[in-house]
Amino acid sequence: MAVFEGTYQVLGTPRFGIVISRFNDLITTKLLEGCQDCLRRHGVDPNPHGSQVDYAWVPGSFEIPLVAAQLAATRRYAAIICLGAVIRGQTPHFDYVAAEVTKGIATASMQTGVPIIYGILTTDTMQQALERAGIKSNKGWEYALNALEMANLMQTLPSAINPPTTKLSSSTRILTDG
């Protein structure tokens, strides 16, 4: 029986994509800083003018899955990290956005086979978001660590001869053999 587990070691010179929401940028820029710090400390150069990390800024969290899917479809990235903050307000808007972003990121990852890290804070208050973006800890660091581990794991997993494809049918994912 085999056991597969990723490490935080960078194999080769992997390229990462980071998709960041401008909405709630007080939070998302702090998440980005934590993410960049983690990547740097693990041997990845986060310089936007370098060759290891590409950045895509989008208007809000709702737009993140589309851009993440497009980046992943290029097969240029070992992993994509999505950074956003959805904070509950007085309307049901929070529920719709949080649910669709979650589904969209999961679908994009399954369809492309590229690890797409869910780095979307969903909090009830701005204070909770601030605590997770640097006051108490920085979740951006954790999201980058997840990306490193998943990139490494995907490199070590055996390749499938005929990998399953994901098809969408009535918003339900169905795995098929062809």
Curated annotation (Swiss-Prot):
<feature type="binding site">
    <location>
        <begin position="90"/>
        <end position="91"/>
    </location>
    <ligand>
        <name>(2S)-2-hydroxy-3-oxobutyl phosphate</name>
    </ligand>
</feature>
<feature type="active site" description="Proton donor">
    <location>
        <position position="93"/>
    </location>
</feature>
<dbReference type="GO" id="GO:0009231">
    <property type="term" value="P:riboflavin biosynthetic process"/>
</dbReference>
<comment type="similarity">
    <text>Belongs to the DMRL synthase family.</text>
</comment>
<feature type="binding site">
    <location>
        <position position="118"/>
    </location>
    <ligand>
        <name>5-amino-6-(D-ribitylamino)uracil</name>
    </ligand>
</feature>
<dbReference type="InterPro" id="IPR034964">
    <property type="entry name" value="LS"/>
</dbReference>
<feature type="binding site">
    <location>
        <begin position="61"/>
        <end position="63"/>
    </location>
    <ligand>
        <name>5-amino-6-(D-ribitylamino)uracil</name>
    </ligand>
</feature>
<comment type="function">
    <text>Catalyzes the formation of 6,7-dimethyl-8-ribityllumazine by condensation of 5-amino-6-(D-ribitylamino)uracil with 3,4-dihydroxy-2-butanone 4-phosphate. This is the penultimate step in the biosynthesis of riboflavin.</text>
</comment>
<feature type="binding site">
    <location>
        <begin position="85"/>
        <end position="87"/>
    </location>
    <ligand>
        <name>5-amino-6-(D-ribitylamino)uracil</name>
    </ligand>
</feature>
<dbReference type="InterPro" id="IPR002180">
    <property type="entry name" value="LS/RS"/>
</dbReference>
<protein>
    <recommendedName>
        <fullName>6,7-dimethyl-8-ribityllumazine synthase</fullName>
        <ecNumber>2.5.1.78</ecNumber>
    </recommendedName>
</protein>
<dbReference type="GO" id="GO:0009349">
    <property type="term" value="C:riboflavin synthase complex"/>
</dbReference>
<feature type="binding site">
    <location>
        <position position="23"/>
    </location>
    <ligand>
        <name>5-amino-6-(D-ribitylamino)uracil</name>
    </ligand>
</feature>
<keyword id="KW-0686">Riboflavin biosynthesis</keyword>
<keyword id="KW-0808">Transferase</keyword>
<dbReference type="Pfam" id="PF00885">
    <property type="entry name" value="DMRL_synthase"/>
</dbReference>
<feature type="binding site">
    <location>
        <position position="132"/>
    </location>
    <ligand>
        <name>(2S)-2-hydroxy-3-oxobutyl phosphate</name>
    </ligand>
</feature>
<comment type="pathway">
    <text>Cofactor biosynthesis; riboflavin biosynthesis; riboflavin from 2-hydroxy-3-oxobutyl phosphate and 5-amino-6-(D-ribitylamino)uracil: step 1/2.</text>
</comment>
<dbReference type="GO" id="GO:0000906">
    <property type="term" value="F:6,7-dimethyl-8-ribityllumazine synthase activity"/>
</dbReference>
<dbReference type="GO" id="GO:0005829">
    <property type="term" value="C:cytosol"/>
</dbReference>
<dbReference type="InterPro" id="IPR036467">
    <property type="entry name" value="LS/RS_sf"/>
</dbReference>
